[in-house]
């Protein structure tokens, strides 16, 4: 018989990037007494990955737990970006309700829509937390209306529309239920969670059922499965059967060697866990997301939503440039292969395939951000490699027609730039679905656009809107192929010879376009050192020295004025490269180069193409 476990609440937090979700969790941890008074708490405690802290994005779902009035509240932090949507769908299976965190000025954002839609489809109750109410430009009353409009757009039920609103300033550590209340602490939010989020249900007397929803990885114990106990109990040394709903015939017996629950930010070893508990289980080799751990007497897998398929792919290639091996610690194909396959332990939305060449691996993911985060992580770990331009993964329908991944693009731009943005996105096969003007002088545009139309567009968008535009995208399924798109109108400036860049050579080269390098930098033949002002590629000699005579002294070089080079970030470089180019990634440098370095062989290849 199913019973409610009143001492547990399982909730997920949904929020757009930078709306204060992680700060809110930090405050709940502090005010529930998880940290000692004298303990230093790193800001953004939930974002444990360096890139997450720097970019302010959450990539991997994290688990934490706090206690309030004798009730254990398990909090799961969901990624706010659609590229990591693979994480989101699975996390929501573990919880009985969600907290939607919305900025009191910006209101609900498109990325939030993606996760919220999944939560509403699963019929989860929602608490809306309007955060940052202490911002001078906050407009909480309007934001409430916007949230309710969003709920209606997403076909929320009447019960879901009747959700509680909590107003908070996570930074100040306070929450209130009415705007007229005096803020004191986070108590109103804690109380709302206990009152509104239902306790987990399950049959304690039934056989064990634990659905693995996320995978953690630890060098010492290997793969760790994290999931909720749906029925029965699970104990250390218990024999269980691993079975997957998508392959119910494959069963194997294993033993639970260690069992953990979450307390604060730590995993705490326990001997057994009952219905509603969120547990981490180690000692089961080859455990995967979607596996159910069942008692051997009645191995019934829990139905599980398949992980979203990748939409974009890149080739990761061993670096073979003339400067290879000088800056990285891990440079061989064995290093690259091991690292990419290790990533599969924790990132289930990723695919890694071997190719005809032992030096190259095809890596597929959910979007450019997804793959760029992997590249940045590897770079920081000391890896050196090259990557190709991102390519879109096509499919065919039952009639053999070509389908391509589509995205919904939501754009907020100052009114004067809306015409430029509409023109650019239309050229990239975007279809304008709606357009509305806000009183603040901003225009909101909604487009349906092929994923390949967005590759390389973000940098252009920021330039076109002078940095004032906001562009958010969400994967929107597969649609009919929209035809060819005309891309970059500007060619590359290619180094003609290897050596060191000289001021004199750069001074002559800068007339041709924008340079990416400074004097003294090492270059090699076939390396892209700048962007041409015209459509074709041009070879230039940046190592050219001035002929010295009695009347021409080298000190005259100091009078040459160089325009500062354009330093490309990883994302900008990935956007810039063309299909015949590679991005060389090392711990210290990002260099763009032609796939074929030799100029004669390159010309021959271009002729045959």
PLM feature spans:
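Structural and coupling elements of P-loop NTPases
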Residues: 1-609
């Amino acid at each position: 018989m199913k019973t409610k476990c009143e001492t547990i609440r399982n909730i997920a937090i949904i929020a757009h990037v930078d709306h204060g979700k992680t700060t809110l969790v930090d405050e709940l941890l502090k005010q529930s007494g998880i940290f000692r008074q004298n303990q230093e708490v790193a800001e953004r405690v939930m974002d444990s990955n360096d890139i997450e802290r720097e970019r302010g994005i959450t990539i991997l779902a994290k688990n934490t737990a706090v206690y309030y009035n004798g009730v254990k509240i398990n909090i799961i932090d969901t990624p706010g970006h659609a590229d990591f949507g693979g994480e989101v769908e699975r996390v929501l299976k573990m919880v009985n309700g969600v907290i939607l965190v919305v900025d009191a000025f910006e209101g609900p954002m498109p990325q939030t829509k993606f996760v919220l839609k999944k939560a509403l489809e699963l019929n989860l109750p929602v608490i809306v937390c309007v955060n940052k109410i202490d911002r001078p430009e906050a407009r909480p009353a309007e934001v409430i209306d916007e949230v309710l409009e969003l709920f209606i757009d997403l076909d929320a039920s009447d019960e879901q529309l009747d959700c509680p609103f909590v107003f908070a300033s996570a930074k100040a550590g306070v929450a209130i239920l009415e705007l007229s209340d005096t803020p004191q602490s986070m108590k109103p939010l804690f109380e709302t969670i206990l009152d509104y989020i239902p306790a987990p249900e399950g049959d304690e007397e039934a056989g064990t059922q634990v659905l693995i929803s996320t995978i953690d990885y630890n060098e010492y114990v290997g793969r760790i499965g994290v999931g909720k106990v749906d029925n029965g109990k699970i104990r250390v040394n218990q024999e269980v059967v691993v079975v997957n709903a998508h392959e119910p015939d494959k069963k194997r017996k294993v033993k639970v060697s260690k069992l953990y629950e979450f307390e604060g930010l730590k995993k705490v070893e326990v001997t057994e866990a009952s219905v509603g508990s969120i547990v981490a289980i180690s000692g089961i080799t080859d455990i995967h997301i979607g596996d159910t751990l069942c008692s051997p007497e009645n191995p019934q897998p829990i139905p599980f939503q398949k992980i979203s398929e990748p939409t974009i792919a890149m080739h990761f290639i061993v670096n073979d440039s003339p400067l290879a091996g000088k800056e990285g610690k891990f440079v061989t194909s064995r290093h690259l292969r091991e690292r990419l396959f290790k990533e599969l332990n924790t990132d289930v939305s990723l695919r890694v395939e071997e190719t005809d060449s032992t030096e190259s691996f095809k890596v597929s993911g959910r979007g450019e951000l997804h793959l760029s985060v992997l590249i940045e992580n590897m770079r920081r770990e000391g890896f050196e490699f090259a990557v190709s331009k991102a390519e879109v993964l096509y499919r065919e329908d039952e009639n053999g027609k070509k389908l391509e991944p589509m995205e919904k693009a939501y754009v907020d731009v100052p009114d004067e730039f809306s015409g430029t943005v509409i023109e650019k996105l239309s050229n990239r096969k975007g279809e304008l679905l709606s357009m509305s003007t806000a009183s603040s002088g901003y225009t909101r545009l909604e487009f349906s656009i092929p994923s390949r139309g967005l590759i390389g567009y973000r940098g252009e968008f920021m330039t076109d809107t002078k940095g004032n535009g906001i562009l958010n995208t969400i994967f929107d399924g597969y649609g009919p192929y929209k035809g060819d798109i005309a891309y970059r109108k500007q060619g590359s400036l290619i180094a003609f010879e290897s050596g060191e860049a000289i001021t004199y050579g750069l001074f002559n080269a800068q007339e041709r376009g924008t340079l990416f390098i400074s004097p003294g930098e090492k270059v090699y033949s076939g390396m892209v050192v700048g962007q041409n002002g015209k459509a074709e590629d041009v070879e230039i000699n940046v190592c050219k020295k001035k002929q010295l005579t009695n009347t021409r002294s080298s000190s005259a070089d100091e009078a040459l004025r160089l325009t500062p080079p354009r330093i490309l970030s990883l994302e900008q470089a990935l956007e810039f490269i063309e299909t015949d180019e590679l991005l060389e990634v090392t711990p210290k440098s990002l260099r763009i180069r032609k796939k074929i370095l030799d100029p004669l062989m390159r010309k021959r290849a271009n002729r045959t193409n």
